[in-house]
């Protein structure tokens, strides 16, 4: 955020540089703290987020079509998956139904107009970076505790770039981004 907001650096170059820095720094910190070659110790079963079985998942399992969809596709994920899905309508509501969302979208589209209205462009951009950091932290927590049992070098395997591609394809809209990411997830699962 500082590189592109305060120092007005190119966002693409800053983003790639931060990714390279984070990739090396996480391994270095992991090596110093745990001395396991840049990995973390495996989490014990109680340290991971357990899958949640939704109501009627077992009862509906034998029902054709609906059963497999409910019991295998929708049920059995960790709490972080359901939180992420619940955040899609919340994100849409904040972006399209609140003053903060209007200002946030305006900062991206026309920062001069926002500045003329007396709103701090830098402040709004830093708020966006902070919110993005929280959401990316949720994604990282899922990778480290839900998908795997600890940190391993390059464990994201480019998923951040895939998420960025999904966002661009969805034209920065939350509901379309959900559909695009579900499509990408389906294609990855095949």
What are these regions (language model features)?
Residues 1-23, 184, 188:
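Alpha-helical transmembrane segments within multi-pass membrane transporters and channels
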Residues 6-8, 123, 171:
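Helix-loop interface residues and adjacent transmembrane-helix termini in multi-pass membrane transporters
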Residues 23-39, 136, 140-144, 148, ...:
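Juxtamembrane/transmembrane-helix interface segments of polytopic membrane transporters
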Residues 23-96:
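Transmembrane helix-bundle core of multi-pass membrane transporters
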Residues 136, 146-190:
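Transmembrane alpha-helical segments in multi-pass inner-membrane proteins
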